[in-house]
Amino acid sequence: MSERQGGQEQDREADGVTTEGISEMSQTLQALADGLPVDAFAVLGPHPLADGRRQVRVLAPGAEAMGLIDSRGKLLARMQASAIDGVFEGILSIEGPYRLRIVWPDMVQEIEDPYAFAVTLDESLLLQIAAGDGQALRRALGAQHVQCGEVPGVRFAVWAPHAQRVAVVGDFNGWDVRRHPMRQRIGGFWELFLPRVEAGPRYKYAVTAADGRVLLKADPVARQTELPPATASVVPGTDTFAWTDAAWMAKRDPSAVPAPLSIYEVHAASWRRDGHNQPLDWPTLAEQLIPYVQQLRFTHIELLPITEHPFGGSWGYQPLGLYAPTARHGSPDGFAQFVDACHRAGIGVILDWVSAHFPDDAHGLAQFDGAALYEHADPREGMHRDWNTLIYNYGRPEVTAYLLGSALEWIDHYHLDGLRVDAVASMLYRDYGRAEGEWVPNAHGGRENLEAVAFLRQLNREIAAHFPGVLTIAEESTAWPGVTAAISDGGLGFTHKWNMGWMHDTLSYMQRDPAERAHHHSQLTFGLVYAFDERFVLPISHDEVVHGTGGLLGQMPGDDWRRFANLRAYLALMWAHPGDKLLFMGAEFGQWADWNHDQSLDWHLLEGARHRGVQLLVGDLNATLRRTPALYRGTHRAKGFDWSVADDARNSVLAFIRHDPDGGGVPLLAVSNLTAQPLHDYGVGVPRAGAWREILNTDSAHYGGSNLGNSGRLATEPMGMHGHAQRLRLTLPPLATIYLQAEK
């Protein structure tokens, strides 16, 4: 050994590094430079030497030169390019922080070293997520703006327990999968703080699966995304939106007297479109939609899913970005502005929220870390054959934390007033849409999905605890008992449930020729057998006007006059019937055609007087609902309803009384004649003597009808009828519903 070689060996030994260690380190650095699974924090960044100095290593493929500088830009040490491409090494003789000065071919960058920072995620948060805590997941995962000491930046964090390696790639590192490998934490979580990253860059995670495949995945907890069909996540802005809806939020009290609930269901991308047939942005929607909803006196807007989704033709019901508003309408702040404007206008906002399934797009949740993670591994549990989508594994706490965190995020961050949970029936039953042998029984041998039941209860429990007064509405199409019953009583704890049975029965009845209706009268009356078993919403939703059925008006029988008359009579019957109301956009003015998600509603139809008449009627129905306690205070209580005429199938007449069960206000009588013949001198029993006034008549010329009615005011006769002490003798116009109210 030469004298020089001996000196080199002594230097290395003084630094605490042996020849064998150098060889091992070279292999590690080579693996790191090749993007292979290596503990990056074990080799990159500053590491103490035996003599008190620090060795600094940086991986910067493509850099031409590098130095270490202080906060004022003074050079502290020059970094040497090692034999391994992209790896720079240097010795730092002073204590304290340092920055990197990196010379790239087209720029000089001065930045802190990401690998000089300690962990930024509290281990307790990770343990809480592993126990199913959605609030902890909201605080921990995704791209979060944080400050490490005096250095601002973004902490990226993701759950990928089967991964060998995870790296952040994006606009800030040239999408180079080698540059920024993340730190592995307990429970399969990965994190990395990138200093000085601001809002706006696109990013993804490069996930190395157990078999070595590198998967480019969007962030499951991204708060912002780029515009589809592009699939990257976007670093969001800081949470600085200035809300002005304090008065609205303060009155959202579940203990208050029941209020009217009338929901206008909207697909934001097709309610109206711009001159280039593109969806409106949130500010434009606010300018146009909010005054329209105010004009029609709806209490709430319900948005079809606006969580980010790759395929517009799914209407939003196959989402992948459960924490991000779709970029189709602009920025997340734009959506916040929309909700804020709704609240200032006195309108609540409900979001359709999908926790039943997700699509299998390569950039999404499917096989997120190379293995079944969010979904079940067994397709008998993990795949919806009806929709070719994947089912969440509700038995995995991290998955339920992900879903719970999403629900809480929308309610908290965007001040939403309710969630309508989609496809609940598909969650509750393991054999939903499956033949014998295509599903796996639960632990007790049954068909119920016990894990999904537990998740739904936890969802409703947490929303009620953290955000009292927020609605949770189940789209549940079976007879599962107690959907809206208290969890303590064995129920699921939803505030409301869609009444799919009422919708199917009554629509089927209305689609029949009036001459045939006498034989199907029970389709009108059967819903009252169970109307008070749950807190129901009566839904005429988007599902009723697609797949060739035509619009609601187009489904009515007869010539044009009869179609309009049928529609008006049906809507007024619906508004008088027990249950809260939901109407999909377009039905309020009588759209003829199927709803088309790729174009605007047929607003030109409002040039026709009959279409304007339907629109005027809907506004008047909502106004009547708002000012009539008998129509809403007892809408979920049997004490608020009495039959007058339930059995006149021959004349297709239905008549009932609505009361305020708490004794306020005056009763309302609703009578529907669903034949094409007027009925004169028709006796109907009522509970109160004196004058009754016709307050609404769908056959009014005001709405496009023949203007047959009861001249405003009638007096009762002291003759018992239909179980009531008094009766009214009425003129019932054809294909019409009338409301009469006792005078005080």
Swiss-Prot record:
Pfam families: Alpha-amylase (PF00128), Alpha-amylase_C (PF02806), CBM_48 (PF02922), GlgB_N (PF22019). Pathway: Glycan biosynthesis; glycogen biosynthesis. SUPFAM superfamilies: (Trans)glycosidases, E set domains, Glycosyl hydrolase domain. One of its GO terms (cellular component) is cytosol. Its EC number is 2.4.1.18. GO terms for molecular function: 1,4-alpha-glucan branching enzyme activity; cation binding; hydrolase activity, hydrolyzing O-glycosyl compounds. It catalyses: Transfers a segment of a (1->4)-alpha-D-glucan chain to a primary hydroxy group in a similar glucan chain. The active site is at D422, E475. The keyword Glycosyltransferase applies. It is an enzyme of class 2 (transferase). Keywords: Carbohydrate metabolism, Glycogen biosynthesis, Glycogen metabolism, Glycosyltransferase, Transferase. GO terms for biological process: glycogen biosynthetic process. InterPro entries: A-amylase/branching_C, Branching_enzy, GlgB, GlgB_N, GlgB_N_E_set_prok, Glyco_hydro_13_cat_dom, Glyco_hydro_13_N, Glyco_hydro_b. It comes from the Bacteria. Belongs to the glycosyl hydrolase 13 family. GlgB subfamily. Catalyzes the formation of the alpha-1,6-glucosidic linkages in glycogen by scission of a 1,4-alpha-linked oligosaccharide from growing alpha-1,4-glucan chains and the subsequent attachment of the oligosaccharide to the alpha-1,6 position. Monomer. This is 1,4-alpha-glucan branching enzyme GlgB 1. It comes from Xanthomonas oryzae pv. oryzae (strain MAFF 311018). The lineage of its organism: Bacteria, Pseudomonadati, Pseudomonadota, Gammaproteobacteria, Lysobacterales.
